[in-house]
Swiss-Prot record:
Name of this chain's protein: LexA repressor
GO molecular-function terms, A-Z: DNA binding; serine-type endopeptidase activity
Family stated for the protein in its record: Belongs to the peptidase S24 family.
This protein's record includes keyword DNA repair: yes
Species in which this protein is naturally found: Cupriavidus pinatubonensis (strain JMP 134 / LMG 1197) (Cupriavidus necator (strain JMP 134))
DNA bind region: 28-48
Length: 218
């Protein structure tokens, strides 16, 4: 296992804990703010050093494109991983493919298959996996083909990444409530945000993202 400097270990721990608590890695700016760096570029240099030591993987062009490659103790599993994964505590989760208009997201016809995943990688137990389509959440480290682990919920706090139903479509976005309206925020400047007026549009929350499984390996 690579030997990390004390600062590198602190940054690795921040990445791991942020993924564990929110389901997603921190941005360079968030790392810089946490450690008092003068700019995100300083955080980037530390991340590159961690990548060279083989403990993380960086996704070019994504502000949250950080993936843990190793655990730092025998009792830990990586917070983001590729299937299949062996473990003592296993969850069997349905993988939701395309969702037909007007039908429940977990309707039998939407289930592509069942996956077994290690329960220890999630602080909150997910109810299902949703295959991500497109790159609208790229800068949150969520890429086309990834599997998003989702806990069923009809309400969510501001700032959470959610699965939302808007009319006939199901989308993954960051939730923000403003002045009686709801904004579904894309994490990619190439995609527009979506404004929703409750009561005027068919809108519902289907769940909150609690983790991510990379598409590589299956």
């Amino acid at each position: 296992m690579a030997t990390l400097t004390p600062r590198q270990q602190q940054i690795f721990d921040l990445i791991r804990n942020t993924i564990r608590n929110t389901g997603f890695p921190p941005t360079r700016a968030e790392i810089a703010a946490e450690f008092g760096f003068s700019s995100p570029n300083a955080a980037e240099e530390h991340l590159r050093a961690l990548a060279r030591k083989g403990v993380i993987e960086l996704t070019p062009g994504a502000s949250r494109g950080i993936r843990l490659k190793v655990a730092r103790s025998d009792s830990e599993m990586p917070d983001q991983f590729s299937l299949p994964v062996s473990g003592i505590m296993q969850l069997t989760l349905p993988l939701v493919g395309r969702v037909a208009a007007g039908s429940p997201i977990l309707a039998a016809e939407h289930i592509d298959r069942q996956y077994q995943v290690d329960a220890s990688v999630f602080d909150e137990r997910p109810d299902y996996l949703l295959r991500v389509r497109g790159l609208s959440m790229r800068d949150a480290g969520i890429l086309d083909g990834d599997l998003l682990a989702v806990r069923k919920a009809s309400e969510a706090p501001n700032g959470k990444i959610v699965v939302a139903r808007l009319g006939d479509d199901v989308t993954v976005k960051r939730l923000q409530r403003r002045d009686g309206a709801i904004e579904l925020i894309a994490e990619n400047p190439d995609f527009p945000n979506i404004m929703v007026t409750p009561g005027r549009e068919e809108f519902s929350l289907e769940g909150i993202a609690v983790g991510l499984i990379r598409s590589s390996g299956f």
